[in-house]
Amino acid sequence: MSQKSQIIKTLKVLQKWLKESRLDLFDVSSKIIQHVEESYPDDAPKSKTAKSKSLHFSQTGDFPKPEYCQSEFDFAIYSDGACRGNPGPGAWSSLGQNMEGEVLFQAASFSEQTTNNRMELSGALEGMKQFIEYAAEFHISLKKVKIYVISDSRYVVDGMTSWVKGWKARGWKKADNKVPENCELWKEMDEVRESIGNVEFKWVKGHAEHPQNEYCDRMCNELLDRELSSTNTSTSTRNDSLH
């Protein structure tokens, strides 16, 4: 129950007692209730969406508490990426939670031409960036927190827990002396991780009824459906105008 609802409920109990007691304060209590209803805005959740050209979703539903978070300074970032055609149109998504399971932020973004790996990387990267913004807004010290980035992409998790260290040691080159694919994204991922400090990447099996992972997957695919439907409609309209 919101704070506003609790205040009104308490006042109405008092009002009922005043009415039954036939006290002159009944009318006064009515005016107090009216004032509360008009003056207090409905309570809003302490969630934040990234300030970017992205499609944000407000209906998160109920999620369980993040599986790795053990203290108030532990936070979880779930991310996902999708691509149709690979390469082709794609989308990334991210969702941030605290230890209690409260959704702190969520976002999804569409790309006209990309790959699945780039979208998986982008989901994790943008999720970390959003957490940094959230921490700054609510005065949370990055020195105190531990972040768990949870993804169903082995590419992301193995890259950040194993490959990046070797690439950096070789001047961002692979063992065969070639530049890693999506190198600019890997570099940015590494920089953002270092700016936070304590970040651990965890793998979760995709399409295995994991609520947060399934939600991120749904955000990606719903955004893709919407964007591609809009594109097809626009193309159809242009073709019709030529006849």
What are the functions of these language-model segments?
Residues 1-46:
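Short, low-complexity, charged amphipathic interaction modules
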Residues 2-4, 82-86, 125-215, 239:
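RNase H catalytic domain
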Residues 17, 35, 188, 192, ...:
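Residues that form generic nucleotide/phosphate-binding pockets
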Residues 37, 103-106, 112, 136-146:
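Phosphate-ester processing/binding pockets and catalytic centers
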Residues 46-60:
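Non-catalytic propeptide/linker segments at domain boundaries
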Residues 57-118, 129-134, 217-218, 222-232, ...:
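RNase H-like nuclease fold core
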Residues 120, 124:
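Short, conserved alpha-helix that lines the donor NDP-sugar binding/gating region
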Residues 233-237:
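Threonine-centered tandem repeat motifs in low-complexity domains
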